[in-house]
């Protein structure tokens, strides 16, 4: 069963939104903007951001918004504008180099220390080099070979969950999170005895209780990963980290020490958030649409791949792409974002844009491929998620196995959109 659908050419919408370089009468380039509070747009934004995004999109594709701490960001909404922003060379992910010019933040993110030399924090050509070396080993063949192990892990975790005497559990704690953590640890060759510590670091960095706690967790993880790299260099295994240590391109280029441990750190953190959110949001979408759940239960073998793609489109695992900083003035959707502007790209809204997806607020696991293809759940352009095939594989196995083994599974109580838990009963 393929992890991805074949690509098809994309033609930008010709509806009411202006093209990426066009000025509009309402918002000509250079016009000052007053920052808006998303909670003023919709007080329920934290629980369900989609109505606020839709209101903003109806006014235009780029908006200056303010955060709870007084931060100011340029928020990009709508499919065409988001694709443009994701591929704009004027919007940088290299905070090490361009962070000092950022405006609207109390301070730029601290990215100078060890563990930050990964491709998510680099622009081409540095990013191109790092991704090329990583892609030599993190291949679709390696990911496909993981499916039997992912299936065994899923079954073992479900065995433990279904043994609960009160027939209740949280799917995130019982299944989604331990599955993802175990898969990443096995992929990197991390010994069983070290995984509890790894879980603590991952929890704190992916969902920090404070900026200081996240930095402290990274500071603890980096020496461990450095030692792991040294051990794998001395005694290679058949894991991904060992392969990355020894891979080189045609010119003899290799990842250096900091790049190796940074790559391991990226796999831990980026994969944690996207996959766990994907599984939890996907299950919640199914339970919120009993007709679609019934369809999938009746024919999971045929429908599960399309259902996974619809889950990704309908409620993106990560609502906004990692922030970028404008290294030069850039026009997107008729609005000039000034040099130093910090830009958030609303992936979740892009995939609910009626200019690209018919009836986008309808959850339809039988949506025709042409009507779901091209979603931005995993980003777009050079920073498109390298781990997307693995996330799709895990989602497909988990959803299919849940439906097969837990025919009476149901949500255990009401959940808001922002709730990361998925309490269930059976």
Identify the residue ranges that each predicted region occupies.
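Cytochrome P450
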Residues: 1-426
């Amino acid at each position: 069963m393929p992890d991805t659908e074949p690509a098809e050419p994309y033609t930008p919408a010709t509806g009411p939104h202006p093209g990426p370089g066009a000025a509009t009468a309402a918002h000509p380039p250079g016009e000052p903007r007053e920052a808006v509070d998303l909670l003023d747009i919709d007080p329920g934004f934290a629980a369900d951001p989609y109505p606020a995004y839709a209101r903003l999109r109806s006014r235009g594709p780029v908006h200056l918004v303010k955060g709870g701490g007084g931060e100011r960001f340029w928020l990009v909404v709508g499919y065409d504008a988001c694709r443009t922003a994701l591929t704009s060379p004027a919007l940088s992910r290299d905070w090490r180099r361009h962070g000092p010019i950022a405006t609207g933040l109390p301070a730029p993110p601290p990215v100078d220390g060890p563990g930050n030399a990964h491709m998510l924090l680099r622009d081409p050509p540095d990013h191109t080099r790092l991704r090329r070396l990583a892609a030599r080993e993190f291949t679709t063949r390696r990911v496909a070979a993981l499916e039997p192990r992912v299936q065994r892990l899923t079954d073992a975790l479900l065995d433990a969950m279904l043994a609960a005497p009160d027939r209740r559990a949280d799917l995130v704690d019982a299944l989604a999170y331990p599955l993802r953590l175990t898969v990443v640890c096995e992929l990197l060759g991390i010994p069983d005895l070290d995984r509890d510590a790894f879980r603590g670091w991952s929890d704190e960095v992916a969902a920090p209780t404070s900026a200081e706690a996240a930095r402290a967790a990274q500071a603890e993880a980096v020496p461990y990963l450095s030692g792991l790299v040294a051990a794998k260099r001395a005694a290679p295994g058949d894991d991904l980290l060992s392969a990355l240590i020894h891979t080189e391109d045609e010119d003899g280029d290799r990842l250096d020490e900091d790049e190796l441990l940074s790559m391991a750190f990226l796999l831990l953190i980026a994969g944690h958030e996207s996959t766990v959110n994907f599984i939890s949001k996907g299950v919640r979408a199914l339970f919120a649409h009993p007709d679609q759940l019934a369809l999938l239960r009746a024919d999971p073998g045929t429908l599960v791949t399309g259902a996974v793609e619809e889950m990704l489109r309908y409620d993106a695992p990560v609502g906004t792409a990692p922030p970028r900083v404008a290294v030069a003035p850039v026009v997107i959707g008729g609005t000039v974002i000034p040099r130093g502007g910090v830009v958030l790209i609303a992936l979740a809204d892009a995939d609910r844009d009626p200019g690209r997806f018919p009836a986008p607020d309808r959850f339809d696991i039988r949506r025709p491929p042409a009507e779901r293809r091209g979603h931005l759940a995993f980003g777009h352009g050079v920073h498109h998620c390298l781990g997307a095939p693995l996330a799709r594989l895990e989602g497909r196995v988990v959803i299919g196995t849940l439906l097969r083994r837990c025919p009476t599974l149901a949500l255990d109580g009401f959940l808001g959109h922002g709730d990361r838990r998925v309490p269930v009963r059976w």
